[in-house]
Amino acid sequence: SENQDTPEERAAFDFLYASTKATKAEPNVHLNFNHAMSRVNLKFVPGTDPEGNPVTLTDIECYLVGIKRNGTFDTETGVAAVTEDAAVSDLRQMLNADNDYTFTAYLLPQTIGAEGLQIEAAMTTADGRRI
């Protein structure tokens, strides 16, 4: 789950899985697909700074911190699994008006620690402040 900057790149990580059996008596099959990956969506909306001043969104540098990004997908069972001893790394995306200030990523299902999912984001405001 390395490069997910664009919708086209993210589509490569959205694994779908379906399984069924055809028989001679029932040769037509219906496939019900399920997503094997976990999707994370973060949408940033304008608000106010700590002093109560309105903030207009500009380019936002956003990270999911400490994510395991290596694993396997079993095509027999449809199970996506993180490699438990995989190194952790950060997943970065630049958010702007073109992507509606929305971070979207497909991740291998994994257990996040008790502290929860850590998100870091920074933006330079129109008047030059870094928040």
For the regions a language model picked out, list residue spans one by one.
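Short, low-hydrophobicity acidic/polar segments
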Residues: 1-56, 87-127
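Short, ordered, surface-exposed loop/turn motifs in non-cytosolic proteins
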Residues: 50-86
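Edge beta-strands of extracellular beta-sandwich domains
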Residues: 129-131
